[in-house]
């Protein structure tokens, strides 16, 4: 018996990487992170400490798959927090303590979730393999079958609220042709609440009321897709961006400016030039029809003003008074030894009000990840003029981002 237990323990240690588990525990202690394991998934946040405002609505969650079995939250959460504040992160686990290879990250708004899909889909991990990042379907409705004919909506709603959390409403369908089965559609406040209810309702009805019911996800299409199992891509065929040649770094043998180290740490990136060179990701895939709320795009109106330029570290900019945004960003990158920004722009759509919307990608060699965003402009007198305007607006957004997530200042 003892020999069998030792063999099982050795087998478990072979499955679980002790060094990776130690790194996870150290990361949790260092950052005061609390992870809660509930019914096959380990959860962070929902809400996280310091969260202000209501819980995010639909469209704010992304589905992450192709996660290696020994990659845990200490690698994944900082990576996805590099896009924006995470409201909730759920990593699916099996009984051995391994991950099941997929997780969910929920952001505060759909725009940030869209940026996560655009930026981190096909992101290559140092451990090997590429992450797959998609929009989560966020199913919230369960179908309860084989209910007794005497059941009514108000009674069922009261019972469900006692047995599960997050019940919003219940729609009871009349008995079928044989008059023996009643079906109910139950809406929950979140996919997590519905998923937890799905795990407990069958047994709860059997133990408390002696009733054997069926519980499954409501099918909205012919193809069955269950969200607590790895899901396939439901998006349209993506548009593959033209690959960029690997850029060379300016001052390659000199580390980046110290004020950028918080940015590298925030995104889980390296803090030396040699490591950053190894971490430059391949161009990602962008969907043609990713919808961005116009209210979010209009936030571009609050752009960084043209500010007087002040030399730093003994290096003087080309213009001692002021620069346009493109030149300004170029100057910031040169001063902080990040390399020259490279722009990639694609037309997105034309709005009824006449504005043209463009998606941009700015690759700065000294940063571990490209920067993505959307801009809107009015039609110009020439293609060259419009291109210059798009570059200017993109540069302004990038300057804002650099100033927000690091100690850099635009002057």
From Swiss-Prot:
<protein>
    <recommendedName>
        <fullName>Dead end protein 1</fullName>
    </recommendedName>
</protein>
<comment type="function">
    <text>RNA-binding factor that positively regulates gene expression by prohibiting miRNA-mediated gene suppression. Relieves miRNA repression in germline cells. Prohibits the function of several miRNAs by blocking the accessibility of target mRNAs. Sequence-specific RNA-binding factor that binds to U-rich regions (URRs) in the 3'untranslated region (3'-UTR) of several mRNAs. Does not bind to miRNAs. Germline-specific protein required for the primordial germ cell (PGC) survival and migration during early embryonic development.</text>
</comment>
<dbReference type="GO" id="GO:2000145">
    <property type="term" value="P:regulation of cell motility"/>
</dbReference>
<dbReference type="InterPro" id="IPR035979">
    <property type="entry name" value="RBD_domain_sf"/>
</dbReference>
<dbReference type="InterPro" id="IPR044448">
    <property type="entry name" value="DND1_DSRM"/>
</dbReference>
<dbReference type="GO" id="GO:0005634">
    <property type="term" value="C:nucleus"/>
</dbReference>
<feature type="domain" description="RRM">
    <location>
        <begin position="60"/>
        <end position="138"/>
    </location>
</feature>
<keyword id="KW-0963">Cytoplasm</keyword>
<dbReference type="GO" id="GO:0005737">
    <property type="term" value="C:cytoplasm"/>
</dbReference>
<dbReference type="GO" id="GO:0003729">
    <property type="term" value="F:mRNA binding"/>
</dbReference>
<dbReference type="InterPro" id="IPR012677">
    <property type="entry name" value="Nucleotide-bd_a/b_plait_sf"/>
</dbReference>
<dbReference type="Pfam" id="PF14709">
    <property type="entry name" value="DND1_DSRM"/>
</dbReference>
<keyword id="KW-0694">RNA-binding</keyword>
<dbReference type="Pfam" id="PF00076">
    <property type="entry name" value="RRM_1"/>
</dbReference>
<dbReference type="GO" id="GO:0043186">
    <property type="term" value="C:P granule"/>
</dbReference>
<dbReference type="GO" id="GO:0060965">
    <property type="term" value="P:negative regulation of miRNA-mediated gene silencing"/>
</dbReference>
<dbReference type="GO" id="GO:0043073">
    <property type="term" value="C:germ cell nucleus"/>
</dbReference>
<dbReference type="GO" id="GO:0060047">
    <property type="term" value="P:heart contraction"/>
</dbReference>
<dbReference type="GO" id="GO:0048255">
    <property type="term" value="P:mRNA stabilization"/>
</dbReference>
<keyword id="KW-0217">Developmental protein</keyword>
<dbReference type="GO" id="GO:0003730">
    <property type="term" value="F:mRNA 3'-UTR binding"/>
</dbReference>
<dbReference type="GO" id="GO:0010628">
    <property type="term" value="P:positive regulation of gene expression"/>
</dbReference>
<dbReference type="GO" id="GO:0007281">
    <property type="term" value="P:germ cell development"/>
</dbReference>
<dbReference type="GO" id="GO:0003723">
    <property type="term" value="F:RNA binding"/>
</dbReference>
<dbReference type="InterPro" id="IPR000504">
    <property type="entry name" value="RRM_dom"/>
</dbReference>
<keyword id="KW-0539">Nucleus</keyword>
<dbReference type="GO" id="GO:0008354">
    <property type="term" value="P:germ cell migration"/>
</dbReference>
């Amino acid at each position: 018996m003892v020999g069998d237990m030792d063999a099982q323990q050795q087998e478990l240690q072979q499955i679980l990487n002790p060094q990776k588990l130690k790194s996870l525990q150290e990361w949790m202690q260092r950052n005061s992170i609390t992870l809660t394991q509930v019914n096959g998934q380990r959860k962070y946040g929902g809400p996280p400490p310091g969260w202000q405002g209501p819980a995010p609505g639909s469209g704010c969650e992304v589905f992450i798959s192709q996660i290696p079995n020994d990659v845990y939250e200490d690698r994944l959460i900082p990576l996805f927090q590099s896009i924006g504040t995470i409201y909730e992160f759920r990593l699916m686990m099996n009984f051995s303590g391994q991950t099941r290879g997929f997780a969910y990250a929920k952001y505060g708004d759909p725009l940030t979730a869209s940026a996560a899909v655009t930026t981190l889909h096909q992101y290559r991990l140092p451990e090997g393999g590429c992450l797959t990042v998609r929009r989560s379907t966020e199913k919230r409705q369960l179908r309860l079958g084989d209910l007794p004919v005497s059941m009514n909506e108000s009674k069922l709603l009261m019972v469900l609220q006692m047995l599960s959390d997050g019940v919003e409403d219940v729609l009871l369908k009349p008995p079928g042709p044989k008059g023996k089965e009643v079906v109910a559609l139950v809406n929950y406040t979140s996919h997590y609440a519905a998923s937890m209810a799905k795990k407990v309702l069958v047994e709860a009805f059997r133990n408390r009321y002696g009733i054997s019911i069926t519980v499954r996800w409501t099918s909205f299409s012919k193809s069955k897709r269950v969200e607590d199992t790895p899901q396939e891509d439901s998006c349209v065929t993506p548009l593959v961006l033209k690959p960029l040649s690997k850029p060379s770094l300016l001052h390659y043998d000199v580390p980046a400016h110290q004020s950028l180290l918080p940015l590298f740490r925030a995104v889980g990136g390296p803090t030396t030039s040699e490591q950053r060179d190894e971490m430059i990701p391949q161009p990602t895939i962008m969907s043609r029809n990713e919808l961005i709320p116009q209210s979010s795009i209009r936030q571009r109106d609050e752009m960084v003003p043209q500010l007087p330029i002040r030399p730093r570290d003994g290096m003087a900019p080309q213009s001692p008074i002021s620069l346009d945004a493109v030149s300004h960003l170029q100057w910031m990158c040169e001063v902080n030894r990040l390399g020259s920004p490279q722009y990639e722009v694609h037309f997105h759509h034309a709005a009824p009000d006449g504005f043209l919307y463009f998606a941009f990608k700015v690759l700065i060699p000294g940063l571990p990840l490209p920067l993505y965003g959307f801009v809107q402009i009015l039609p110009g007198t020439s293609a060259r003029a419009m291109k210059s305007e798009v570059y200017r607006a993109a540069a302004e957004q990038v300057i804002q981002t650099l100033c927000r997530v690091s100690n850099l200042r635009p002057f």
